[in-house]
Amino acid sequence: MRFAYKYRLYPNRAQVHFLENQLHEACDLYNAALQERRDAWKVCRKSINYYDQANQLKPMRAEGLIGLANFSCCQDVLRRLDKTFQAFFARVRRGERPGFPRFRSFRRYDSITFPSYGNGCRLLDDGKLRIQGVGLIKIKLHRPVRGRDQDRYDQAGRESLVRVFFRRARHRRVTGVEQGDRP
């Protein structure tokens, strides 16, 4: 079973600026990866997948072309694009109106995902959140976070700077009794 916990962040002005810069970088990476896939197909009739683009991340970061602080965030951006293309091709196979993947504006790209707990983002015991490159951010923990740490995913959204933790809990057997005359 998966639970989502949503908490509000209270960053200072410099931290807000850094998080918005990371959103810009993630959006630019998404659009550049989409452009690369489109151009490769138009010019060479070559299909590019996630692994082809993920192999380019390390050299691009070494040259300073990508400014995202966390490598896993870059990989997640490419995974998002790959899921978009998989959904597009699935709609084509089903004969539905496909809707080719579009470029995203900064306004529509509103979250950064840290795919694994501790890799770029960690919740500390004193009620603060440590984000790689940003530092400690105050967070209002209005209810306790339960579940296993290794299965937590963190997202930083632009709208009112909210942090969402997804946690897995052990599956409990649930028994229910329903009364009434509805089938």
Residue ranges and their predicted role:
Residues 1-183:
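Nucleic-acid substrate recognition interfaces
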